[in-house]
Structures are given as structure tokens and as C-alpha cells.
Amino acid sequence: TGSGNTPQLPKICMELGRGIKGLIGHTQPRRLAARTVANRIAEELKTEPGGCIGYKVRFSDHVSDNTMVKLMTDGILLAEIQQDRLLMQYDTIIIDEAHERSLNIDFLLGYLKELLPRRPDLKIIITSATIDPERFSRHFNNAPIIEVSGRTYPVEVRYRPIVEEADDTERDQLQAIFDAVDELSQESPGDILIFMSGEREIRDTADALNKLNLRHTEILPLYARLSNSEQNRVFQSHSGRRIVLATNVAETSLTVPGIKYVID
């Protein structure tokens, strides 16, 4: 994890001659991740999204006749099977974040195993940070396992229970977040990432933090239903401190730059 394999794998496939007889399909569990990864690969190749690097998510299709790598959600690939049972438009398929084991991902893994005997030319790559690789290898008839070393950094963990054992008064989650933000405001500069369970919780917390009028601090929500421009704000350069409130999309599917502190 953290090795940068998500944007690099499709480029390696292209260098090996894949993506010519068919597309290199690359699935992500979330729309935001699919779009962000496509933009990142296009940027590294000094091209625009929609050219040789395209993406397709619900309500947005940026794939052209020149596209070689197609980022998409796993739901899009699953839907395409209805019209293209042999997935003939692809010569390579990368299933990313397989450890999430969603219904879509599990259906795809089962279907692709059944498909491979009929499509011996099709290359399947399953990637993940945390899955049991031997188990997935056995599922695909003892497929080879390639391990990529991740990058780790020293982490200090501070436990701040919402309910103190010696104190009967119970803080709510919002107050616990305020206290944590206040504690981190005494530390050296760096952006804060707060993990939350869903959109409503994020909106309510963002409203509450904005009312505190924290100096030189920008509050940024990050969830699937935000517009593209609002989501892209987390990747833009900025001054001062940022507090990003996100679902677990920021845990595995994409990297938010500048984060030094995490409140979970």
C-alpha cells in the first residue's frame, strides 16, 4: 500500500503492448477514485483525460476511439457484461482494491474465473493492499503472486475515548472532534483528515466546524455526491490549514495531499 501501483500498473501494461488489440480496463470501487486515477495517469503521460486515458462512471463517459486505458467503477464493468458476455472490447482487466469484497467485486471475480477458459488471451490483474494473496491465487488456478513493497512512515497514535471512565459526563462525537482539532491546532502545521461514516455526518460536522471560524483554516467535505469541481478542491494547492472530512474513499482509493494528522 502506498507504493503507487494504481496509476503505474496500466502504464506498465501499455509498455508491454497491451491496450492495442483491446482496452486495458481498470476498475475502482468508487466514481471519485476512477476519475482521479484517470486524471493522474493522463497527467503523468502529459495528455488530457478522454484521449488515450479515459474513464467511464455513472452519468459521465470520457472514452474515445483513441482510448487505450479505461478507468471505471466495478459496477460499470458488471453492467457491460450484459451486452458483451466475453468482454471482447478488453485485452487486459485490472480489478483494483479487491480487498473491499463488495458484491460487485465478488461477482466480477467469479465471472472472470469462468470467462478465462473462453478468453485465454485476456490478462487479469487483481490488486489489493490487504487481501490474502494465496486465497485469491487458488481461486484463479494458482495464478502467480507479485508483491510490491509499500512505503511506511512512523505514526504516533493518540487514543482519546469519547467516554472517560472516571467521568460520568459523555461527550458527543462532535465535541470529541472539536477537542481533537483544538489539540492538533497546538501542533506544527499540516492538514487534518477526519474519517466519517457518511454524507450527512460529514455535512453536519463541516457546518459545525465552519461556525467555529478557525483562523487560516479551510473546511473541505469529500464524498461521492459532490460535484467534480468541489471534489477536486482537495487536490489543489492552498495556504493555511485544511480540514478534510471524508468517507473511507480517502483510506484506500485515493491519496489526499498534505495530510499530517488523522482523526478517526
Task: Give the predicted meaning of each segment.
Residues 1-264:
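P-loop NTPase motor module signature
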